[in-house]
């Protein structure tokens, strides 16, 4: 059995990254795929579940994990730690399961340095106008917050060229097909196929 592939997925807020990852998992139940769940020291919010949205841990435990080198990357945001578990990702990949890692461009850089075989995907909105419309449609944020998110989006988008693949999420179903095509192509690479079909290949080449 071959190893799984780590997919780094980045996008500005409102580009549809989370929806695409969720749809990929729901519509392709035969694919061995999981989403990486980050560790955090922030308090759990209503509706969140430990181990599903985040692994909620105490600050002391998080700092112990840092000292042990258990994180591929971590950052402190507004006084709370967030980190990606190296151990969980490596164990999952060893089982032949692909892992999606939803992370920003800065975290993506850190991950690529440590796991150069990871594949990276950047998801773009079709226009600034459409991105702003999607953010407004959520109905969650004030005009001030949306303006801030739009500025952050421009900064995030400026790093799209650092990624292996780029998907434009104009039509959701088309973007989802593009997403699946990337996974399919990666699974058909020689290295993956040679591991998957080792017995068959040995038989084909036997004298």
UniProtKB/Swiss-Prot annotation:
InterPro entries: GK/Ca_channel_bsu, Guanylate_kin-like_dom, Guanylate_kinase, Guanylate_kinase_CS, P-loop_NTPase. Essential for recycling GMP and indirectly, cGMP. This is Guanylate kinase. Belongs to the guanylate kinase family. Its main location: cytoplasm. One of its GO terms (molecular function) is guanylate kinase activity. ATP binds at residues 11-18. It is an enzyme of class 2 (transferase). PROSITE patterns: GUANYLATE_KINASE_1, GUANYLATE_KINASE_2. It catalyses: GMP + ATP = GDP + ADP. The keyword Nucleotide-binding applies. Keywords: ATP-binding, Cytoplasm, Kinase, Nucleotide-binding, Transferase. It is found in: Cytoplasm. It comes from Vibrio parahaemolyticus serotype O3:K6 (strain RIMD 2210633). GO terms for cellular component: cytosol. It holds the Pfam family Guanylate_kin. Its EC number is 2.7.4.8.
